[in-house]
Amino acid sequence: MLLKGKTAVISGAASKRGIGRATAELFASHGARVAILDINADEAKAAAGDLPPVEHGAHIGLRCDVADRASCTSASDEVLSAFGVANILINNAGITQPVKTLDISDADWQRIVAVNMTGVLNLSQVFIPNMRQNGGGSIACMSSVSAQRGGGIFGGPHYSAAKAGVLGLAKAMAREFGPDSIRVNCVTPGLIQTDITGDKLSAEMRADIVKGIPLSRLGDARDVANIYLFLASDLSAYVTGAVIDVNGGMLIH
């Protein structure tokens, strides 16, 4: 077990086919006690209840709007009251919107940036002090291939910009908090089959996309969860400020 005795906080982890949920299940199977944060409180609690049991206490599910600092503070208070420590933070929550540059409204821009980028800052700010007090930790942040290639299939330019911002923020935090033994890394998935993407691809679209992927398939949520596990565990003890592509070779630098 790679995470036995550890506690992990994962945002955006209630959706049944989502990357966050797959990560929570994988972490629990490796011995971690997990706090699932999600905008929907009932779904978060249900998801936590479905996780494999661990030796050192029950998992919890809490409501958290990552775009709202007060909501993040409240969630962190509840997590630390229940667990005492947060060893791992997975900044996974995100939303997308497939609109073009000239169609992006101010409200669109603010919401996409607030959830995808500001949310990473908000949750990191409320959990880093506890990590410092307890000798370090690991933070992994969800970016996207969209940030690297200038857009994607389901995300507009504002999504691409927000996810690019996550890359810069994570690298800056890695540099700042390295002396505190807090590692910060990013994951940049390609097209992953989740609740968001699963029903939006026709057979023709899917076949066309797969032609451009050297591994000849779309990704699964577990493909990304496996990388989160690596970054959360001591297997990556000397890795910080890194960006790990999980795209089947869709983007080879």
UniProtKB/Swiss-Prot annotation:
NADP(+) binds at residues 10-35. The active site is at residue 159. GO terms for biological process: fatty acid elongation. It comes from the Bacteria. One of its GO terms (molecular function) is oxidoreductase activity, acting on the CH-OH group of donors, NAD or NADP as acceptor. InterPro entries: NAD(P)-bd_dom_sf (IPR036291), Sc_DH/Rdtase_CS (IPR020904), SDR_fam (IPR002347). Substrate binds at residue 144. Its EC number is 1.-.-.-. Pfam families: adh_short_C2. Keywords: Oxidoreductase, Plasmid. Belongs to the short-chain dehydrogenases/reductases (SDR) family. PANTHER family: BLL7886 PROTEIN, SHORT-CHAIN DEHYDROGENASES/REDUCTASES FAMILY MEMBER. This is Uncharacterized short-chain type dehydrogenase/reductase y4mP. It comes from Sinorhizobium fredii (strain NBRC 101917 / NGR234).
